[in-house]
UniProtKB/Swiss-Prot annotation:
Gene: CALCA
Keywords (A to Z) from UniProt: Amidation, Disulfide bond, Hormone, Secreted
Localization of this protein: Secreted
Taxonomic source organism: Sus scrofa (Pig)
Main location, first listed in the record: secreted
Protein known as: Calcitonin gene-related peptide 1
PANTHER family assigned to the protein according to its UniProt record, in alphabetical order: CALCITONIN GENE-RELATED PEPTIDE 2, CALCITONIN-RELATED
Residue numbers bearing the Phenylalanine amide modification: 37
Family, similarity comment: Belongs to the calcitonin family.
General function of this protein: CGRP1/CALCA is a peptide hormone that induces vasodilation mediated by the CALCRL-RAMP1 receptor complex. Dilates a variety of vessels including the coronary, cerebral and systemic vasculature. Its abundance in the CNS also points toward a neurotransmitter or neuromodulator role. It also elevates platelet cAMP. CGRP1 can also bind and activate CALCR-RAMP1 (AMYR1) receptor complex.
GO terms of biological process kind: adenylate cyclase-activating G protein-coupled receptor signaling pathway; calcitonin gene-related peptide receptor signaling pathway
Intrachain S-S bonds: 2-7
One Gene Ontology cellular component annotation held by this UniProt entry: extracellular region
Entry GO MF terms: hormone activity
């Protein structure tokens, strides 16, 4: 439905954040994880 590069980029980023957000947060937690490792 959207053709502009910006819109496509945002849609891809949204899909990645939704599908890979849980996995990323498990392997790369923000602050607490860096201290734990």
């Amino acid at each position: 439905s959207c053709n502009t590069a910006t819109c496509v980029t945002h849609r891809l980023a949204g899909l990645l954040s939704r599908s890979g957000g849980m996995v990323k947060s498990n392997f790369v937690p923000t602050d607490v994880g860096s201290e734990a490792f």
